[in-house]
Amino acid sequence: MTHILTIAMAQLNQLVGDLKGNADAMLQWRAKAEAVDLVLFPEQQLIGYPAEDLVLKPAFQKAAARELERLAAATADGGPAMLVGSILKEGDALYNIVALLEGGRIAAIRKKHELPNYGTFDEKRIFAQGPLPAPVEFRGAKLGLPICEDGWLPRVRTHLAAQGAELLISVNGSPYEIDKDDRRLEEVFATRVAETSLPLIFLNRVGGQDELVF
């Protein structure tokens, strides 16, 4: 990586289903971070997390796509790029995604590969599994973009390292539970960084939804 990137991490609460409100909050945060290269937002920040069966409604899927395009258009001003968590409908498949927004467009999309299906999570019922993701080229750097569970398990991280990623950016919707911080330290920070020898940025959300606290 030859270029020094300045990255801002936006830990925002969100309201499930409030697409415009969530998008407006991201744009307001971006306006305060005008001197950075990239602003990061948590997993599914645009739609709210977990949105559960709301994401299965075609009208909601289309509205989410429109708001993502609106966010992308805002980056035409030459300010910071944004990494935004949302959903993507392709054919009959629905994906949990992160989108890199830069230069007024959606510059890249990566789909979540590891879908959790335990405890409060039933993503295999809702989402299709994305392919193992390739790194994203951004301003002279190769970024690996594991989405939440992608970063907890080794497959995606080691694949990204083998594909030449220089920095891992993991956006999360990881709820609180007893000893969770210690688990993150061991399972994500120490173990996965040691496996790949790559620097890691880990961003989680704040707030709560239903019975979950982040």
What are these regions (language model features)?
Residues 1-214:
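Enzyme catalytic cores with a strong preference for nitrogen-chemistry domains
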